[in-house]
């Protein structure tokens, strides 16, 4: 009797786990299409066709004695096909009510943090930030972790223009 109950519980657990895991496993997996210096062009196929985006990782992270996790700066074409939207993705949750700043060659842009990501506060700032990235050489991102740690990341902008040109042709 006890063995039957254990087998039933195991079978139900496996069924529940597969029901939960199936949607996650069904998500499209991005693959790198091409490397453009510091930036990679990635694509994945979904229900709406092929989606592309460009992504880079920091060349420097501060403070040095903190576990930053995996951090990325991503730029993707807007679904409308007109322009791009930039996004910071951090390896940790950001402090609510804080502000993230992106500085490209002395020009500063504000990002709104939510969870572990940040986007420009106004959609109209997307084009200005992307234009600055295309003409700039380096970008710094400053953020505050949920624990209150001030963090700073430096990204190379080498290759971002070519990567964005290719991303705009994708799909």
Provide a role label for each language-model segment.
Residues 21-23:
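N-terminal signal peptide c-region/cleavage motif recognized by signal peptidases
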Residues 25-171:
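A generic "folded-domain core" signal
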Residues 1-2, 171:
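Short, intrinsically disordered, low-complexity terminal/loop segments
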Residues 2-13:
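Bacterial N-terminal signal peptides that target proteins for export
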């Amino acid at each position: 009797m006890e063995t039957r109950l254990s087998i039933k519980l195991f079978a139900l657990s496996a069924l529940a786990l597969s029901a939960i895991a199936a949607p996650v496993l069904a998500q499209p997996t991005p693959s790198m299409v091409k490397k453009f210096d510091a930036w990679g062009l990635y694509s994945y196929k979904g229900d709406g066709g092929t989606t592309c985006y460009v992504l880079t990782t920091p060349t420097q992270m501060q403070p040095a004695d903190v576990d930053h996790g995996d951090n990325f700066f991503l730029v993707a074409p807007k679904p409308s096909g007109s322009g791009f939207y930039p996004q910071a993705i951090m390896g940790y949750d950001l402090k609510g009510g804080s502000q993230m700043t992106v500085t490209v060659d002395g020009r500063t842009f504000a990002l709104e943090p939510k969870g572990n990501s940040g986007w420009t506060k106004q959609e109209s700032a997307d084009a200005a930030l992307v234009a600055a990235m295309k003409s700039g050489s380096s970008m710094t991102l400053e953020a505050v972790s949920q624990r209150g740690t001030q963090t700073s990341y430096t990204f190379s902008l080498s290759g971002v223009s070519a990567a964005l040109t290719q991303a705009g042709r994708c799909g």
